[in-house]
Amino acid sequence: MVNSQVADKEKLDAQTNNQDSVATIVTTENNKKYTIPDSEKKIVYSTQNLDLWYGENHALQNINLDILENNVTAIIGPSGCGKSTYIKALNRMVELVPSVKTAGKILYRDQNIFDAKYSKEKLRTNVGMVFQQPNPFPKSIYDNITYGPKTHGIKNKKILDEIVEKSLRGAAIWDELKDRLHTNAYGLSGGQQQRVCIARCLAIEPDVILMDEPTSALDPISTLRVEELVQELKENYSIIMVTHNMQQAARVSDKTAFFLNGYVNEYDDTDKIFSNPADKQTEDYISGRFG
């Protein structure tokens, strides 16, 4: 296996010699290969030999994946392949399941989040989460946005007002809601609720935003607005998004990881994944032959 990996690497280096960027080839334990083009962007997350179990169910197997900052990284794959489990591992939300066990490392900004001394609270401040179903609190729009800052000790009303406006502008919904800040968020449309949830996430100034099927419950117009917002947000945030929608992944992401049966089957630039995938199973999935 080692000799095979070395041969693959030497062959790839020869092919890319004299080019501006050189790709790194990775061979996973199940012999799936994926390439990660070198980039000037920093690595925000490096997953190394990650295995995860729910009881006896081996949900993630030997995951090795580097996520670049200020990119949108799409996680695709059929139901049950480990997509949502993976992103919930990135902020340790999987630990809410009593039977979960992990092995391997997830480095966030070069620190292993599984280290005993690593603060889960700090991690979840730096890494925000937007869920599949819009989940505003049963409070006013204003109180939804200020919940996180208040939890972190901010009490000054002027500062809170500024956070509310900045966050709602960041979620591209300030103009729609600026005159309704003290009305209940439950009275908003589904698309508006989801953008309020994104604004609530932005209010704590995260570094990374995890999105688990953020538009699956939305109508086409609301979906388009959220997709446009994702493109704007990547200027300041690193976004990792699970989606079943192949067109969405192709539209909004810079890189795509295809998960299959708990493995990373293929990972590359999104354009390459959708135009010239290296693996037959990847091609079959994105063309709709299974999934």
Swiss-Prot record:
Keyword terms of this UniProt record: ATP-binding, Cell membrane, Membrane, Nucleotide-binding, Phosphate transport, Translocase, Transport
Catalysis: reaction(s): phosphate(out) + ATP + H2O = ADP + 2 phosphate(in) + H(+)
Top EC class for this record: translocase
Xref: PROSITE patterns: ABC_TRANSPORTER_1, ABC_TRANSPORTER_2, PSTB
Domain spans labelled ABC transporter: 45-286
GO molecular function, one term: ATP hydrolysis activity
Bilayer topology term: Peripheral membrane protein
GO biological process: phosphate ion transmembrane transport
Ligand binding (ATP): G77, P78, S79, G80, C81, G82, K83, S84
Cell compartments where the protein resides: Cell membrane
GO cellular component, one term: plasma membrane
EC number: 7.3.2.1
Sections of the chain in a coiled coil: none
Pfam families documented for this protein: ABC_tran (PF00005)
Function: Part of the ABC transporter complex PstSACB involved in phosphate import. Responsible for energy coupling to the transport system.
Self-association state and partner proteins as the record states: The complex is composed of two ATP-binding proteins (PstB), two transmembrane proteins (PstC and PstA) and a solute-binding protein (PstS).
Xref: PANTHER family: ABC TRANSPORTER I FAMILY MEMBER 17
Family: Belongs to the ABC transporter superfamily. Phosphate importer (TC 3.A.1.7) family.
The protein's name: Phosphate import ATP-binding protein PstB
Organism of origin: Staphylococcus epidermidis (strain ATCC 35984 / DSM 28319 / BCRC 17069 / CCUG 31568 / BM 3577 / RP62A)
Underlying gene: pstB
